[in-house]
């Protein structure tokens, strides 16, 4: 396989384009959560609680659903500490070795997990269809940051500027709001299909050709002109297969959504998650193809993480409420407490999913420890 080598131009210490990621994220979190809490508190007439396991504290009717989000916050803080410790330790390692990577992106993952805990806690003050967007925004953002972090490991010189990334996130949030105000509207999902197609074409070309293609080229005529000038290298088969898989899934999801409009928030969350999983598996396969390996601790962590994810999804699917049903129908789904006589199924989902996310973020952090002693310029890019 004819791959390029990693460019040594990245810093890996928080400078450059990635340095502002966590700073922007904190600012976004403050300005997003503040009005969100106001909306949730003053929109308390349609709240869906598990009537068989709701423990009130003050004016909060289901405090157990709120406090169980503390695990996201604690794991986020712990992860930031781990990243800091690793960064300090890395300063003593031979320079210009291993994958470079922007440490700022890892700090952003920790911040995103903390913000997910805060936003989910706020949402559970009054769980409803309208408020559901607040429960998933930072989950989606964390998934997108994970994809970017994995990509950045071997493409540090091509890291997207923070403001461009958050502009994309802004459009996702805007679409989420439009979907809430126009549920099931054909025009919305038709527009989504066109947008998906547009992003798939330009995104695929950018990911395939790399630095030869400028991300700022967004018009069709400019695209055709630029493609004619690109080098005609031998096909990068692994990358081509990855893009085919991603495009098949994403296009299929867009067609399904246009034909049978689902809930947009859940839809975009699933599409983002599956894209991340496909890319992660692709990364692992190419590590092995190129003679790299994984430490046994990483393999064990991946095994445990898979079990936690499966268990978390079980408790999430076995729901005790449904915010998309009328309140009376949702109340009939109530289930008894399952943990310590205090926490219900959804609380267990919070605990298990927070644990799974924490382990996965650590896997991302330590994934390439096996090549720490290899000169950066000799590490293949994929």
Language model segments and positions:
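Long, hydrophobic alpha-helical transmembrane bundles and adjoining juxtamembrane helices/loops
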Residues: 1-382
């Amino acid at each position: 396989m004819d791959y390029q080598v990693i460019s040594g131009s990245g810093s890996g210490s928080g400078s450059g384009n990635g340095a502002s990621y966590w700073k922007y994220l904190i600012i976004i979190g403050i300005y997003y959560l503040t009005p969100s809490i106001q909306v949730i508190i003053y929109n308390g007439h349609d709240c869906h609680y598990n009537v068989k396991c709701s423990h009130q504290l003050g004016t909060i009717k289901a405090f157990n659903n709120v406090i169980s989000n503390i695990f996201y916050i604690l794991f986020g803080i712990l992860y930031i500490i781990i990243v800091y410790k690793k960064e300090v330790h890395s300063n003593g390692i031979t320079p210009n070795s291993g994958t470079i990577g922007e440490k700022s992106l890892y700090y952003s993952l920790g911040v995103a997990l903390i913000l997910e805990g805060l936003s989910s806690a706020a949402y559970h003050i009054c769980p409803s269809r309208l408020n559901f967007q607040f429960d998933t925004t930072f989950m989606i953002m964390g998934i997108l940051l994970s994809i970017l972090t994995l990509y950045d490991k071997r493409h540090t010189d091509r890291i997207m500027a923070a403001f461009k990334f958050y502009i994309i996130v802004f459009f996702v949030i805007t679409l989420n709001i439009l979907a809430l105000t126009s549920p099931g509207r054909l025009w919305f999902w038709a527009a989504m299909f066109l947008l998906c197609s547009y992003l798939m074409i330009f995104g695929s070309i950018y990911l395939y050709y790399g630095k030869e293609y400028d991300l700022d080229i967004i018009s069709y005529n400019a695209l055709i002109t630029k493609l004619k000038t690109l080098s005609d290298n031998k096909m990068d088969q692994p990358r081509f297969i990855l893009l085919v898989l991603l495009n098949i899934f994403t296009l299929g999801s867009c067609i399904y959504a246009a034909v049978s409009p689902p809930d947009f928030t859940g839809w975009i969350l699933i599409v983002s998650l599956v894209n991340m999983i496909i890319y992660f598996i692709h990364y692992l396969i190419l590590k092995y193809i190129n003679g790299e390996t994984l430490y046994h601790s990483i393999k064990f962590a991946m095994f445990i993480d898979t079990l936690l994810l499966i268990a978390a999804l079980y408790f999430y699917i076995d729901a005790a409420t449904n915010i998309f049903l009328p309140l009376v129908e949702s109340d009939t789904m109530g289930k008894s407490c399952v943990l310590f006589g205090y926490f219900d199924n959804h609380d267990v989902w919070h605990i298990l999913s927070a644990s799974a996310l924490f382990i996965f973020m650590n896997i991302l952090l330590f994934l390439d420890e096996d090549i720490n002693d290899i000169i950066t310029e000799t590490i293949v890019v994929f």
